[in-house]
Regions:
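Short, Lys/Arg-rich, polar N-terminal cytosolic tail immediately upstream
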Residues: 1-23
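The first (N-terminal) embedded transmembrane alpha-helix
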Residues: 22-47, 162-163
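Membrane-water interface of transmembrane alpha-helices
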Residues: 66-81
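Juxtamembrane boundary at the C-terminal end of a transmembrane helix
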Residues: 167-178
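Structural signature of hydrophobic alpha-helical transmembrane segments
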Residues: 56-67, 122-134
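Interfacial loop-to-transmembrane junctions
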Residues: 141-163
């Protein structure tokens, strides 16, 4: 797909193909972090899985969301471009959504620690949520850095981004305790 076609599909004006921060990749990564946190919150509240089951549930959830997201992108592109898509279009959509899986692995890493005898499964899932919240805060801060915001505004963006993670965990907690 050409750069012009990508602009039409995404509805944004991209200054170039090569940027220091790839906003699409970062947004997919954030999407995966939040999705992983939703799965983790459900695991903490509802189940008593082994550490390995918890890890697999988080990662397989990321894989399922990746597939759904890539498929939605493919359908959207077909409609926007009004043409049949090629195998390379399918491969690109899958590749562009890959950060969802990467982030699923990142938030699932603490779920492996009980296997080493370092903590309980419940504690590891809490640690996974904290990892997600910290990553969201870092993303918010770095977004402010990339747009040359003041230090105070960068901190505000970090707090706001972390707040999204806390809200996800809180909503899941409330839903599972009502």
């Amino acid at each position: 797909m050409s750069v012009t076609e990508m602009k039409e599909v995404k509805g944004i004006d991209q200054p170039s193909q090569h940027r220091a921060v790839d906003s699409h990749t970062l947004s997919e990564f954030v999407y995966g972090i939040i999705t992983g946190m939703v799965v983790i919150a459900a695991l903490v509240q509802e189940r008593e899985d082994t550490w390995w089951q918890a890890f697999l549930i988080i990662v397989s959830g990321a894989v399922a969301v990746w597939m759904a997201h890539a498929y939605a992108e493919i359908i959207g592109e077909r409609l926007a471009l009004r043409r049949r898509l090629t195998g390379s279009d399918f491969a690109r959509a899958m590749r562009n959504s890959w950060p969802i899986i990467t982030s699923g692995f990142v938030v699932a890493i603490p779920a492996l620690l009980p296997g080493l005898g370092l903590m309980s499964v419940e504690t590891s899932l809490t640690a996974s949520n904290l990892v997600g919240i910290v990553i969201l805060a870092l993303v918010g801060y770095l977004a402010g850095t990339a747009t040359k915001e003041s230090q105070m505004y960068r901190i505000l963006l970090a707090v706001g981004s972390a707040g999204v993670g806390v809200a996800v965990v809180a909503i899941e907690y409330i839903v599972h305790h009502l």
